[in-house]
Amino acid sequence: LVVLATTVVSFRSNRASDGRKIAVNKRRRELVVPPGKLRECCGRVGPMCPKCMCPPRRC
């Protein structure tokens, strides 16, 4: 009985860690942006860069 209870607890913790791994991998995929979607704006490069709002001499 004691071994069975320990096994059940370990399965639950493994499932929880799997859920965390899936969430981390999902976030990682969101952070990876194809090169064509990156824009340079005022010296910064990013996926969600708005239109450049700097003075014309800086852009």
Swiss-Prot record:
Signal peptide, first to last residue: 1-10
Domain of life per record: Eukaryota
An example molecular function term from Gene Ontology annotations: toxin activity
InterPro entries referenced in this protein's UniProt entry, alphabetically: Conotoxin_a-typ (IPR009958)
Propeptide: 11-37
Keyword Transmembrane: no
Entry GO CC: extracellular region
Tissue occurrence: Expressed by the venom duct.
Compartment list: Secreted
PTM field: Contains 3 disulfide bonds. They are not indicated here, since framework IV presents two different connectivities (I-V, II-III, IV-VI and I-III, II-V, IV-VI).
Disulphide-bridged cysteine pairs: none
Keywords from the named record: Disulfide bond, Ion channel impairing toxin, Neurotoxin, Secreted, Signal, Toxin
Keyword Signal: yes
Family, similarity comment: Belongs to the conotoxin A superfamily.
Domain notes: The cysteine framework is IV (CC-C-C-C-C).
Protein name stated in the entry: Conotoxin Bu26
Organism from which the protein derives: Conus bullatus (Bubble cone)
